[in-house]
Amino acid sequence: MKEFDLPPDGAEELRALLEHSGAAFQREGNRFRLRFASRGCQWQTVCDCQGSLVLVYGIHSARVAQRERALELCSELNSRAVRGSFFLQEERIVFRTSAQLTERFEARERIAAALEYNAAVLSSQWERIAAGAQGLVLPRNPNTAGPA
């Protein structure tokens, strides 16, 4: 196979994207850690690269105090998420998206889209997730636009 026929390497494409954008990140093999900030919220994002697949995990900063309510909220948010899913991991609510890289010419675009969607969903649901982690219920605002 010629090099252009091979699927892109997710770790190398993500590294190039982050370096080009000027984002600060830490790399440990095929795992990348970076901080995101939007709408006054800050959180950690972890990307795991598995060949041509890049998994993006946005980790909400609130510790879960009420596990049952947090799981209910994850289920509720998952019913509306277009791409990706919410789950509970180590007392944190996490939103996972992914980018499957098939062509080199669009690899960085796909990774950027997965990162942007992850950040948009997490920031648009920030207050609901923080409340849900504490066992509280915030009503959904039907006028609030958001991916989830």
Show where each model-derived region lies.
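Long, continuous compositionally biased terminal/linker segments
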Residues: 38-66
